[in-house]
């Protein structure tokens, strides 16, 4: 007991330190376990995480696309392609201003003030004369105050809102010809015309007694000097689609009326350049008092009709000078003058190897030969015009008119009935039958297999579009369609059962000129350079489709100018679908945001791994202001 030692002060302090460290270890362990279970609880979805707060903020933003069925794809902040411009936040997007109300019917390439600088001879001043780069108007064209969505087809054939085309000139100048009447807040189209006082239906029935309009052999027509396009409007019920054209002149609203009625039409004139169509495009050509001097200038204008007329096609003429013996007093012309004019026309038609089928009362019909076998043999006897050499018959963009005859493709035999270029199927089989230009191998790289697969591809794509856009899927919501890069016309062919018509554009920059194939399918279209404005009025189309257009025009012209032209020709509340590489669409959407279009980017129909995406857009409704109000929406 005497050897026992009490613990020293130092040993007591050491014991207390060990106890404190133990407590700390236990406390840290408890906290770690607690944080672990809290983390598990949050990841299970029962907690409020930062991501869930962020999602709540996103979903609270209102969206005006009730038909949206797939997620919006947003590449603006995360896409890092080297050629993209710096990201612009929504707060910094500069809106493209609206134009003044004086631009509400602006047609850039048929602008009256500019056209007066060109020769009046042969109406050259009424041809396309587009602005220079420094003259391009870079603002959004307003609809007139009070603009309303057009009536739906077929009601639109007979009625249009006055506020949409606020012109009464035709109701005065053509009052006795029953073109158009103005009643209260709308225009009525009785279907009359200068040469069809009993109406367009009765007039077409008269033509049908001379040539067969019912068996599907006649599908495409061209109407020169169309007026308000009643001829084309009433042919639609007979499954004949008509390209109507007229110049922008004192009857300044005639083509605009046609488009408002839901009838295909463009601004155009026969003057010094070819029509913007390929050779052998139309089954019939029509002129009802169109006032074109067919027999003058060495028959140049009839030679151009011959170029675009299909082998075996018909040219129909009514009005001066046909039946001049009866009408010469009413036309306020002399008998000798009218007789001379008809003699000139007859002489030119014979020189083209046309055969006059019939002249009955106010109608005359000529037929183009199915081939040029006999025409070439008789060329020495006929004399002028000679056959063209070293010319491209399908060129139709700023190509000068010629006084030579466009030769038809060679035929294998000497039969007069053998169709040069190949016999076309009758409508509706014509739509999906192999076009002769593909069958002959004249289009490089386009085969029968590609044609079939292209048709099937666009059937799938249009079905996919309709799942995204309920307005497109709604029968009758849209009438006037534009395909800016139509290729083989697959987009239009997929819509053939809908009550719509499609203007199929083949850009002049396209690697292969396929517009002839489009016409051989029984569809219509035109050539166009999208660095320039289209020859049409503002608010022409309900729907615009642009497949790879901006990739095609990269480094050719300003993307903003193309989009502003699309804005000009698109109706308020109209829709646009743009397909292109995602880098391109990202740039496009920044501009359409500045144009105050509403849009979203969706996946390719084959899935999200495709670089090509689809931009769905809607143009907002806005108009020119009421008096003393700002024009910007």
Swiss-Prot record:
Glycan attachment positions: 113, 298
The UniProt record lists the keyword Membrane: yes
GO BP term (any one): methylation
EC numbers for this chain: 2.1.1.-
Topology with respect to the bilayer: Single-pass type II membrane protein
Record field: transmembrane: 25-45
GO cellular component: cytosol; endosome; Golgi apparatus; Golgi membrane; trans-Golgi network
InterPro entries: Put_SAM_MeTrfase, SAM-dependent_MTases_sf
Cytoplasmic side: 1-24
Family annotation (SUPFAM superfamilies): S-adenosyl-L-methionine-dependent methyltransferases
Compartments it resides in: Golgi apparatus membrane
Side of membrane Lumenal, spans: 46-633
Superkingdom of the organism of origin: Eukaryota
Key words of the record: Glycoprotein, Golgi apparatus, Membrane, Methyltransferase, Signal-anchor, Transferase, Transmembrane, Transmembrane helix
Family: Belongs to the methyltransferase superfamily.
Protein name: Probable methyltransferase PMT15
UniProt source species: Arabidopsis thaliana
């Amino acid at each position: 007991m005497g050897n026992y030692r009490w613990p020293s002060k130092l040993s007591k302090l050491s014991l207390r330190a060990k106890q404190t460290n133990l407590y700390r270890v236990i406390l840290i362990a408890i906290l770690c376990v607690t944080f672990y279970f809290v983390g598990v609880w949050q990841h299970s979805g029962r907690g409020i995480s930062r991501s869930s707060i962020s999602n709540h903020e996103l979903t609270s933003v209102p969206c005006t696309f009730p038909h949206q069925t797939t997620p919006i794809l947003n590449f603006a902040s995360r896409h890092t392609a080297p050629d993209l411009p710096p990201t612009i936040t929504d707060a910094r997007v500069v809106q493209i201003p609206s134009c003044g109300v004086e631009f509400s019917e602006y047609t850039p390439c048929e602008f009256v003030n500019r056209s007066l600088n060109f020769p009046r001879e042969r109406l050259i001043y009424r041809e396309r004369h587009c602005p220079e780069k420094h003259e391009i108007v870079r603002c959004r064209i307003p609809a007139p105050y009070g603009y309303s969505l057009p009536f739906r087809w077929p009601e639109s054939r007979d009625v249009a809102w006055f506020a949409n085309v606020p012109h009464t000139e035709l109701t005065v100048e053509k009052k006795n010809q029953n073109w158009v009447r103005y009643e209260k807040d709308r225009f009525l189209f009785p279907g009359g015309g200068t040469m069809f006082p009993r109406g367009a239906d009765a007039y077409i029935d008269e033509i049908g007694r001379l040539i067969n309009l019912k068996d599907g052999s006649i599908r495409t027509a061209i109407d020169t000097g169309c007026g308000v396009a009643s001829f084309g409007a009433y042919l639609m019920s007979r499954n004949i689609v008509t390209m109507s054209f007229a110049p922008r002149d004192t009857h300044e609203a005639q083509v605009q009326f046609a488009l408002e009625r839901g009838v295909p039409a463009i601004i155009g004139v026969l003057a010094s350049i070819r029509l913007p169509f390929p050779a052998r495009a139309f089954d019939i050509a029509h002129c009802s008092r169109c006032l074109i001097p067919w027999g003058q200038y060495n028959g140049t204008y009839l030679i151009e009709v011959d170029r675009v007329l299909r082998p075996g096609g018909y040219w129909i003429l009514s009005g001066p000078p046909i039946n001049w013996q009866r009408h010469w007093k009413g036309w306020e012309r002399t008998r000798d003058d009218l007789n001379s004019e008809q003699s000139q026309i007859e002489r030119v038609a014979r020189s083209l190897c046309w055969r006059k089928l019939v002249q009955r009362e106010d109608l005359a019909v000529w037929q183009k030969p199915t081939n040029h076998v006999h025409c070439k043999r008789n060329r020495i006897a006929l004399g002028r015009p000679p056959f063209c050499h070293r010319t491209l018959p399908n060129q139709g963009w700023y190509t000068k008119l010629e006084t030579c005859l466009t030769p038809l493709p060679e035929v294998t035999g000497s039969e007069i009935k053998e169709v040069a270029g190949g016999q076309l199927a009758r409508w509706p089989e014509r739509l999906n039958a192999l076009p002769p230009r593909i069958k002959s191998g004249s289009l490089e790289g386009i085969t029968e297999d590609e044609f079939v697969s292209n048709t099937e591809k666009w059937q799938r794509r249009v079905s996919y579009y309709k799942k995204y856009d309920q307005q497109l899927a709604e029968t009758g919501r849209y009438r006037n369609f534009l395909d800016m890069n139509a290729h083989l016309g697959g987009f239009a062919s997929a819509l053939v059962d809908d009550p719509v018509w499609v203007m199929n554009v083949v850009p002049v920059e396209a690697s292969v000129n396929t517009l002839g194939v489009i016409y051989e399918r029984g569809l219509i279209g035109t050539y166009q350079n999208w660095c320039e404005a289209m020859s049409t009025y503002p608010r022409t189309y309900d729907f615009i489709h642009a497949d790879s257009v901006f990739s095609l025009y990269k480094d050719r012209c300003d993307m903003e100018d193309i989009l502003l032209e699309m804005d000009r020709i698109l109706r308020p509340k109209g829709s646009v679908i743009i397909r292109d590489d995602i880098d391109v669409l990202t740039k496009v959407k920044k501009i359409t945001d500045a144009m105050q279009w509403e849009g979203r980017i969706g996946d390719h129909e084959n899935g999200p791994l495709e670089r090509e995406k689809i931009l769905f857009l809607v143009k907002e409704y806005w108009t020119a202001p009421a008096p003393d109000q700002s024009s910007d929406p």
